[in-house]
Amino acid sequence: MTIKLVCIGKTDKKELEALIKIYSDRLQHYIKFEFEIIPDLKKTKNLDENQQKSKEGELILSGVQNSDFVVLLDENGKQFSSESFSEYIQKRMNTGLKRLIFVIGGPYGFSEEVYKRADSKISLSKMTFSHQMVRLFFTEQLYRAFTILKNEPYHHR
C-alpha cells in the first residue's frame, strides 16, 4: 500500500520542511509514503472563497483514483489517540487498499466536491493549527502509528 499526503501550497519555512522530511524519510522504512504539494493558485484576488475552494478541489480530485481511500484532515473530523490512529491505519491496510490518501485543504478548507468524494474525515485536535504545522504534526503521528504497530520504543504509553 502507498500512503500519500496531499497539501495545497509549499511549506514556507525551511526548518519545518526539514522536520517533515525527517519523518517522511523514516516512514519509508514501513511503507511507501508520498508527499504531494499542489501549487498555490495564482491570481486569487478576483476569486471568492467558494471559487478558490472549487479550483483547489479540482486539483485535489484530479490526482484521486476511484479505488483510493480518501481521508480529509478536517476540524470536524473524528479525533483519535495515537494508539487508536495506529489501529485506524492497520484497518485500512488490512482491506488491501492500494492507496490511502490524506488531504490537507487550502486556507478556506475543502469544496463540496471534495467532501462528497471523501471516505473519511479526521481531526488532529480541537485547536486550530496553521496548515504548515498540520503537515508536520500529521507526518509525525503517521510515523508514530507505525512504531506503535511494530511495538518499537518511539511511543511511550
Swiss-Prot record:
Cellular compartments annotated: Cytoplasm
GO molecular function: rRNA (pseudouridine-N3-)-methyltransferase activity
Key word Cytoplasm present: yes
Keyword vocabulary terms for this entry: Cytoplasm, Methyltransferase, rRNA processing, S-adenosyl-L-methionine, Transferase
GO cellular component, one term: cytoplasm
Main subcellular localisation: cytoplasm
SUPFAM superfamilies with a match to the protein in the record: alpha/beta knot
Entry binding sites for S-adenosyl-L-methionine: 73, 105, 124-129
Catalytic activity field: pseudouridine(1915) in 23S rRNA + S-adenosyl-L-methionine = N(3)-methylpseudouridine(1915) in 23S rRNA + S-adenosyl-L-homocysteine + H(+)
Record InterPro entries: Alpha/beta_knot_MTases (IPR029028), RlmH-like (IPR003742), tRNA_m1G_MTases_N (IPR029026)
EC number(s) stated in the UniProt entry for this protein: 2.1.1.177
Similarity comment text for this entry: Belongs to the RNA methyltransferase RlmH family.
PANTHER family reported in the protein's UniProt record: METHYLTRANSFERASE, RIBOSOMAL RNA LARGE SUBUNIT METHYLTRANSFERASE H
Subunit (UniProt): Homodimer.
Job description of the protein: Specifically methylates the pseudouridine at position 1915 (m3Psi1915) in 23S rRNA.
Protein name, UniProt field: Ribosomal RNA large subunit methyltransferase H
Record organism: Christiangramia forsetii (strain DSM 17595 / CGMCC 1.15422 / KT0803)
Species classification: Bacteria, Pseudomonadati, Bacteroidota, Flavobacteriia, Flavobacteriales
